[in-house]
Curated annotation (Swiss-Prot):
Protein name (Swiss-Prot/TrEMBL): Elongation factor 4
Record lineage: Bacteria, Bacillati, Bacillota, Clostridia, Eubacteriales
tr-type G domain boundaries: 6-188
Cellular localization per UniProt: Cell membrane
A Pfam family: EFG_III
Catalytic activity: GTP + H2O = GDP + phosphate + H(+)
Amino acid sequence: MEWDKDRIRNFCIIAHIDHGKSTLADRLLEYTGALTGREMTEQVLDQMDLERERGITIKMQAVRLNYRARDGRDYQLNLIDTPGHVDFSYEVSRSLAACEGALLVVDAAQGIEAQTLANVYLALEHNLEIIPVINKIDLPSADPERVKKEIEDVIGLDASEAVLASAKSGAGVEEILERIVTRIPPPGGQTGAPLRALIFDSHYDPYKGVVCYVRVVDGSVSNGMQIKMMATGREFEVSEVGIFKPYLASVGELRTGEVGFITAGIKNVKDSRVGDTITEAGRPAPVPLPGYRKATPMVFCGLYPVEAGEYEALKDALAKLKLNDASLTYEPETSEALGFGFRCGFLGLLHMEIIQERLEREYGLNLITTAPNVVYRVKTTAGETIEIENPSKLPPPGKIEFIEEPFVRAVIMAPKDYIGPVMELCQERRGVFTNMEYISVNRVMLNYALPLSEIIYDFFDQLKSRTKGYASLDYELDGYRQSDLVKLDVLIAGEVLDALSVIVHRDKAYQRGRHLVEKLRGLIPRHLFEIPIQAAVGNRIIARETVKAIRKDVLAKCYGGDVTRKRKLLEKQKAGKKRMKQVGRVEIPQEAFMAVLSVGDK
């Protein structure tokens, strides 16, 4: 197909989890003949094993489709698939920056969910043309008219012309493609201007080096060209230029408006940053593209190798993962209990789980993870403000004037029958009610201000179980507020274990400490001496459990005889245990560190 900028359409699909986004992408690929029947598997664009197992999209993927429209002209459509989960909204915002339009996919039975709303607002910020698609119309419980009304009332988009489709059966797919061609504008940009290409993603290939996924905004890029990264100033020679079919396929050149990939023998991971602008070394562009706002990590945890010798391997793996996931942050730290490791920042709990699983699977590492926590702000008596990412770094209580914790604005959508349980859960988690509105006759939208630290444990699971899976949640950071917080330490055999320290609200400290020591008692194996497990706030012990010692029966050989003989043996054993207690080391299994996670409000 001849290149013509006016016949290029760059679009993405936005939807809540499970509204059929990846299946719709499959149908579009199939309809336009991008893949043969043999290559077609379900959820083609979810290429990671993890994505298939969990049934969610984690990484955005790009693919080029060629489509002959009803007007008889050939169009080049670049689809950029996006994730739907709240933790990956950064991936979504990056793919939106590379598009001119978006398909808004809404489940005909479920209606609008919290996540859909958040992504639509992102798309509107980027001035994208939005095409509503009501999916799963073949479900018995589908109610397209109600969903159309919801789209108009809640989002304010005209849904009278929404496409009714079923990604499963393929109904409505041609209509969607026609809408993309007629409604989404062609890309802007100047063909003759110096090259400007936006890196919207990248991954590391052991043979080719860094593979940059780019959207060419101005000019063109071809094999052999000398390019320059505008943020770092480094120069490279392009070795391969290509497109996504969705597998990588070489072409000689990428022109204005096209989406594809570039390799240039970039060996150092830091040289190609996502959001950077690529330009021609000999004829550089005067200003870079706006790029992206930096992702702010919300949740932090420590990652430590089980074997101390794997530290370098972990460092290397994190550097390569960061290339593929720009929202991950990490810095080295040491723990008295766990040795050398990294303090990592994530966008949320699911993001943390995924990164941990990817490190273990893709890089074969064995890891210990400490309990996740948020960033607290501490105003000291000396008048300075410090940010605390690690609970063990909290200053002593005497030096603290007050502590602030991050709050979020949470939007919860649920059927009206579940208003009670949802409000009860939010109150338990120290939530502050802001307002409530009915979206339709049966569905309600609740707005709450909640402490982020209360959300990151099991809030989402609890919300789902109390509403039988019908509620959906979306949240965004809403500044810091002052709270009455204390540090809860865990002492094992009299020693503070820094990796188990957590920062909790004073009202919940006793309950949390009680749960924690009970849980640890079941997880720490018995030793030859007894082990006290204590939870403490400051110098005050608030809960204690004891792991009893394993005792050898020293009286087995004594048959009858004098009681003093037996007492002598028992005293001797007691003295030995006492000595052992002073020098003995307590073995703490990995489960003990994870116990802190699962100590919810039971």
